[in-house]
């Protein structure tokens, strides 16, 4: 059985302390200096995250920030507000990170849409993107999958060019 947050993650004080700090401030732009200020060795933290999650703590922190921006957009916030809420100083940095994940810039997906809607889901295995309409789940994929943007672009094209952000009864 798979227990990604089971004894191994719970027993690793480095993971536990760092995740607690990251969850307490998801919009923070973490640096290795911040990790050192918490009394931890950045290389130890980096190795622990790579071993357990397959990504560095900086990559996970960036995903957490992007998740916050995505949720703000899904709630109807303007793109600039979502960018700032997510801790991105640069509009282009937020746009680029969003487009790498979704295959479209945030303005193309902001607000509700008729038909397909994408939602960011937190799971014990990591972040996932679900795309559904009112009756069917069309896509469920991990956010760190390299082919996700291309898959979302193909799905968007098949759906007439637009996928909104939000939630449906399916998700």
What are these regions (language model features)?
Residues 1-92, 100-102, 107-171:
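Basic nucleic-acid-binding alpha-helical/helix-turn surface characteristic of O6-alkylguanine DNA
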Residues 96:
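An internal, acidic/charged active-site-proximal segment
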């Amino acid at each position: 059985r798979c227990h990604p947050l089971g004894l191994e993650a719970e027993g690793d004080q480095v993971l536990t302390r760092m995740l607690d700090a990251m969850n307490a401030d998801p919009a923070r732009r973490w640096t290795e200096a911040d990790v050192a200020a918490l009394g931890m060795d950045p290389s130890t933290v980096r190795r622990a995250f790579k071993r357990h999650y397959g990504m560095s703590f900086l990559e996970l922190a960036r995903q957490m920030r992007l998740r916050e921006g995505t949720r703000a957009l899904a709630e109807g916030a303007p793109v600039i507000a979502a960018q700032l809420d997510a801790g991105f100083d640069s509009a282009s940095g937020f746009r680029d990170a969003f487009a790498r994940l979704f295959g479209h810039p945030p303005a193309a997906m902001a607000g509700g849409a008729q038909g397909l809607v994408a939602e960011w889901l937190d799971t014990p295995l990591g972040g996932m993107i679900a795309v559904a309409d009112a009756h069917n789940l069309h896509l469920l994929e991990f956010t760190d999958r390299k082919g996700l943007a291309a898959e979302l672009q193909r799905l968007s094209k098949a759906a007439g060019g637009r996928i909104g952000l939000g939630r449906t009864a399916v998700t």
